[in-house]
């Protein structure tokens, strides 16, 4: 893998993930709706306006129009730029310091970088989730915040809850991205090395990164989905005047309530769309990042 300065990795990582976000945001809208459907209700006791992936896409398009499938895109791009810029920058610093060469170093570096990125990007993810949940009453799931724009949402949250209100749900976001980042970066590096060792493809082919991203995406979805469901619930729940959540007290409380009231499988709600979103997003992000690093590395070598 090409070595580039951490500041360059910040730009490349943010750019790669923003590119991926444009393609995968419609899947994020569907996944968010499915994860909020039947919130804290026993299976079979609530209406289900969203049934599976294809039917859910159609339901969103009928209710909100085709552009409704790109709800929250601006906030999503802001989140991807902030979170992944910080994440790849911190991971690059760890690589530069040789920490990823130590046993378990890739996992630890990925987790720490993910935690920092999640904290910085949390306000954007909060707004993205609330915007994507919004729809007409006939197919509405979860609490409806009725924001009009990203700036309008920012102003409303700031006015009603203060600065700390922008970090509502961060307790679910940090572990979500920690496990996802650790799984993604560790398995991508290992998968790429394994594919190169098999010599099925030219060593510098973009197909190596594509194969590595495909393997990595499976690990990411398996470990991340329960935290993703919890994070969606924490971000979208209504809060009282003191900024406290009215449905959940935090990560553990949310997990326990989902388990008890909806059953353990509810922690994997929206798994199909989650893979259809996280899978391609992981594959495209890692592919774009790897290829952009190659280009930056070559440009750096030509300039010396």
Swiss-Prot record:
The chain crosses the membrane at residues 7-27, 45-65, 98-120, 170-191, 206-226, 278-301. It is found in: Mitochondrion inner membrane. It is a multi-pass membrane protein. InterPro entries: Mito_Carrier_Antiporter, Mitochondrial_sb/sol_carrier, Mt_carrier_dom_sf. GO terms for cellular component: mitochondrial inner membrane. It catalyses: a dicarboxylate(in) + sulfate(out) = a dicarboxylate(out) + sulfate(in). It holds the Pfam family Mito_carr. GO terms for biological process: blastocyst hatching. The keyword Oxidoreductase does not apply. The keyword Mitochondrion applies. Keywords: Membrane, Mitochondrion, Mitochondrion inner membrane, Repeat, Transmembrane, Transmembrane helix, Transport. Solcar repeats lie at residues 4-97, 101-194, 204-295. Putative antiporter that exchanges dicarboxylates and sulfur oxoanions across the inner membrane of mitochondria. Belongs to the mitochondrial carrier (TC 2.A.29) family. This is Solute carrier family 25 member 34. It comes from Homo sapiens (Human). The lineage of its organism: Eukaryota, Metazoa, Chordata, Craniata, Vertebrata.
